[in-house]
């Protein structure tokens, strides 16, 4: 047990190193349970983490694209930039979220979020969804707490679910930053920057 030991990644099942206090503490508890005659078992870690960098917060859970590619997973992703709470309430801040999911099963694989207030809350919801085995399209159905100072009627996690649902149903087609270079340059594609000044 400890934060410098190899463990099983909850999402991929692969052996990995996740040097975080939470898995180390869980392993310590499991070791103590077994020493005292129990039969606790460690089920792996998904590497949920959060860090403050000046005025920003960055958080992650599960796996990122690099890991998904290395594992040979057929995945897709959505990237969105919702506000942390209702924009008509003063002080709304934009966060950028990336949510990865397996194409065939819609199994949630991971998420990364960068922004101000509310990033920690959303990454914890996504970490719970991954651990509970929810599929990506079910994020839209989560019944999350709402009041204008804290969220929107459609929470950013719900919005990720709506976007995934629209993508899977074929209602939208998405292009990511890395796709821009391969778009036709014959005038058949128009790039339009729809970002707001806040974004």
Feature roles, as predicted:
Residues 41, 136-140:
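Flexible, glycine/charged-enriched surface loops at secondary-structure junctions
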Residues 140-158:
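Acyltransferase loading domain of fatty acid and polyketide assembly lines
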Residues 117-136:
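A short, polar/charged loop-to-alpha-helix boundary motif
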Residues 190-195:
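Short hydrophobic beta-strand that contains or immediately precedes a catalytic carboxylate
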Residues 197-199:
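Short polar/charged helix/loop
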Residues 111, 124-126, 142-148, 164-168:
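Charged, low-complexity surface segments at secondary-structure and domain boundaries
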Residues 4-117, 152, 156-183, 189:
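Mid-to-C-terminal Rossmann-like scaffold of FAD/NAD(P)H-dependent oxidoreductases
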């Amino acid at each position: 047990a400890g934060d410098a030991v190899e463990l099983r990644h909850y999402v991929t099942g692969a052996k990995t190193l996740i040097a975080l206090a939470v898995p180390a503490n869980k392993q310590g508890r499991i070791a103590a349970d077994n020493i005292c005659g129990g039969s606790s078992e460690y089920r792996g870690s998904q590497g949920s983490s959060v860090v403050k960098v000046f005025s920003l917060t960055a958080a992650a859970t599960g796996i990122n694209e690099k890991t998904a590619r290395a594992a040979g997973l057929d995945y897709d992703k959505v990237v969105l930039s919702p506000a942390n709470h209702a924009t008509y309430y003063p002080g709304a801040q934009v966060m950028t979220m990336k949510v990865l999911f397996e194409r065939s099963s819609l199994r949630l694989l991971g998420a990364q979020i960068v922004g101000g207030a509310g990033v920690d809350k959303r990454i914890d919801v996504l970490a719970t969804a991954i651990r509970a085995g929810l599929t990506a399209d079910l994020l839209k159905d989560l019944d999350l707490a709402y009041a204008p100072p804290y969220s929107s009627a459609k929470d950013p996690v719900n919005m990720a679910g709506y976007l995934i649902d629209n993508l899977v149903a074929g209602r939208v087609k998405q292009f990511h930053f890395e796709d821009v270079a391969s778009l036709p340059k014959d005038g058949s594609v128009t790039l339009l920057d729809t970002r707001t000044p806040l974004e």
